[in-house]
């Protein structure tokens, strides 16, 4: 009797082949799926990185979407000048021109009555006059002593453009907007044949307990640090230096048992602001033991070492560090390209596909 397969056996073999094929396809699909968790203290630039992904890997912001940011631009601009004026009282700084005190009073009245998404010519004029004042500028230069948005000067210097009735925010204006992230914001995009899911998590302390369920199965963590925070205190805790808070958080993430096999990518962000600030504000404010000069290269390298030294598994775990400026699309594009190559190398080899 010949050794032929019955119809039933043939069907079983086909089923087995199909299961193997599906498993292989699922494995390849899983290998192409990348979960990225964006972590870091508040205002370290995480949400700006997410916006850049939309600009770089999707079609960017449509005119309609840009229009929706108009109210945020105006709110950020008004809140910035108000924060400076309030700080003048606290820091006992006088107006360069005494008549600006009337403008300051007017600012509070007009800002309180302002309709969302609109800026009257009267309000724009008041803000412009105040921003030009010598006392206001002196207070702005001491912004490390109070809480002020990074984008304050960007918007206030461009008031003529943004106060026009026909104003539509540009992609750069949108990148500069500041809205506190609450909860978890998820973004999807495809790059180099990989399907990315990026999770932006609220950085303020009150938000951190919401991170936990995002952690499982994460491919890589991008940890953002604002280099320019070295001389600032936290919005939630006036005693805690922001850089020390970042280091504390990085330590807990980097050495967490859940992340033993997770690639950790460190973005030392806001390098542009740091380069400006280090000329006038010494690094010893944050690191009293710092022996070097206050040059960008030396100070930035020292901060990099402070973070990388927190890694307790140096023999088995590498930290991939990049200096970034999250508002610079070309810089983020270049860095993210390098990050993706690391992810491909580290993760596809685990699946035997690299």
From Swiss-Prot:
GO cellular component assignments: cell cortex; centrosome; cytoplasm; heterotrimeric G-protein complex; midbody; nucleus; plasma membrane
PTM: Myristoylation at Gly-2 is required for membrane anchoring before palmitoylation.
Enzyme Commission identifier(s): 3.6.5.-
GO biological process: adenylate cyclase-modulating G protein-coupled receptor signaling pathway; cell division; cellular response to forskolin; G protein-coupled receptor signaling pathway; positive regulation of protein localization to cell cortex; regulation of mitotic spindle organization
Domain G-alpha: residue ranges: 32-354
SUPFAM superfamilies: P-loop containing nucleoside triphosphate hydrolases, Transducin (alpha subunit), insertion domain
Membrane topology annotation: Peripheral membrane protein; Lipid-anchor
Domain of life: Eukaryota
Family from the record: Belongs to the G-alpha family. G(i/o/t/z) subfamily.
Protein name: Guanine nucleotide-binding protein G(i) subunit alpha-1
């Amino acid at each position: 009797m010949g050794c032929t397969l019955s119809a039933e056996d043939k069907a079983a073999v086909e089923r087995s082949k199909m299961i193997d094929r599906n498993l292989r396809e699922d494995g390849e699909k899983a290998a192409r799926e990348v979960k990225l968790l964006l972590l870091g203290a508040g205002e370290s630039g995480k949400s700006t990185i997410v916006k850049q992904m939309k600009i770089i890997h999707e079609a960017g912001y449509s005119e309609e979407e840009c229009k929706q940011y108009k109210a945020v631009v105006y709110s950020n601009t008004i809140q910035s000048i108000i924060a400076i004026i309030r700080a003048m009282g606290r820091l006992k700084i006088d107006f360069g021109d005494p008549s600006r005190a009337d403008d300051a009073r007017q600012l509070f009245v007009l800002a309180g009555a302002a309709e969302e998404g609109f800026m009257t010519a009267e309000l724009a004029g008041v803000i412009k006059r105040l921003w030009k004042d010598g006392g206001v500028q002196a207070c702005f230069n001491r912004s490390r002593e109070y809480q002020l948005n990074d984008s304050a000067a960007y918007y206030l210097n461009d008031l003529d453009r943004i106060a026009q009735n026909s104003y539509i925010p540009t992609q750069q204006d949108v990148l500069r907007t500041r809205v506190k992230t609450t909860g978890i914001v998820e973004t999807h995009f495809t790059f180099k044949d990989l399907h990315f899911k990026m999770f932006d998590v609220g950085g303020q302390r009150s938000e951190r307990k919401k991170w936990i369920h995002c952690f499982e199965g994460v491919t890589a963590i991008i940890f953002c640090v604002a280099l320019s925070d070295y001389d600032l205190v936290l919005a939630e805790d006036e005693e805690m230096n922001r850089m020390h808070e970042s280091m504390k958080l990085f330590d807990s993430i980097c050495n967490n048992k859940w992340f033993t096999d997770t690639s950790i990518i460190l973005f030392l962000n806001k390098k542009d602001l740091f380069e400006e600030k280090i000329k006038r504000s010494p690094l010893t404010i944050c690191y009293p033991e710092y022996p070097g000069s206050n040059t960008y290269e030396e100070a930035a390298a020292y901060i990099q070492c402070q973070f990388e030294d927190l890694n307790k598994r140096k023999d088995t775990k590498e930290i991939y560090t990049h200096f970034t400026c999250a508002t610079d699309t070309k810089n983020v594009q270049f860095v993210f390209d390098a990050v993706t190559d690391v992810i491909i190398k580290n993760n596809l080899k685990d699946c035997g596909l690299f």
